[in-house]
Amino acid sequence: MIEVGDLKKGMFIIYDGEIYRVLEASKHFMGRGSGLIRTKLKNVKTGFVREVNFPSGEKVQEAELSFRKAQYLYRDGDHYYFMTLDDYEQYALSEEEIGDAKYYLVENMEVDLVFHEGTPIGIELPTTVELTVVETEPSFKGDTVSGGGKPAVLETGLKITVPYFIEVGDKIKVDTRTGEYVGRA
């Protein structure tokens, strides 16, 4: 059992007999009374997102999960295919199970497949990934004076803000937790 005040984005819990991934968790305190933990939970099987408010101090069950190293192979329709590196078994995950991780997946990339009772329910990405810029505005001399950045589209369709010196074709590092530019690859 885990206290709801310790819930963090990305954790898996069992609530109402179903497995949920925590999308958001924030603490709210009201005057004298005890606090409230507001969460946004995504049902792993159905993809349904619900908001649940827990009184602080309440406990929930953390889902028992196992992780296996896998390689992302390809996408076919709305399914993503992975091969485990230990026994070379292939698994397909739906777009709902993958979620926003689809914007960081590049063929042959290594990820951790998340299993619950022998069934894959999601993936864990590395902290940073290298992606290629496919579309951005050209930079001009003196652009760096104003600071900030310019919009760019990456090979996976992810749209982020990059510094002015980044050009089309550049490989950059992106933080998978925040979706922000980290540096050149």
UniProtKB/Swiss-Prot annotation:
One CC-aspect GO term: cytoplasm
Keyword terms: Cytoplasm, Elongation factor, Protein biosynthesis
Name-wise, this protein is Elongation factor P
Among InterPro entries, the record links this protein to: Elong-fact-P_C, NA-bd_OB-fold, Rib_uL2_dom2, Transl_elong_fac_P/YeiP, Transl_elong_KOW-like, Transl_elong_P/YeiP_cen, Transl_elong_P/YeiP_CS, Transl_elongation_fac_P
The lineage's top-level taxon is: Bacteria
Q: Which CDD domains match?
A: S1_EF-P_repeat_1 (cd04470), S1_EF-P_repeat_2 (cd05794)
Its subcellular locations are: Cytoplasm
Q: Which SMART domains match?
A: EFP, Elong-fact-P_C
Q: What does this protein do?
A: Involved in peptide bond synthesis. Stimulates efficient translation and peptide-bond synthesis on native or reconstituted 70S ribosomes in vitro. Probably functions indirectly by altering the affinity of the ribosome for aminoacyl-tRNA, thus increasing their reactivity as acceptors for peptidyl transferase.
Entry-linked PANTHER family: ELONGATION FACTOR P (PTHR30053), ELONGATION FACTOR P (EF-P) FAMILY PROTEIN (PTHR30053:SF12)
- Write out the pathway annotation from the protein's UniProt entry: Protein biosynthesis; polypeptide chain elongation
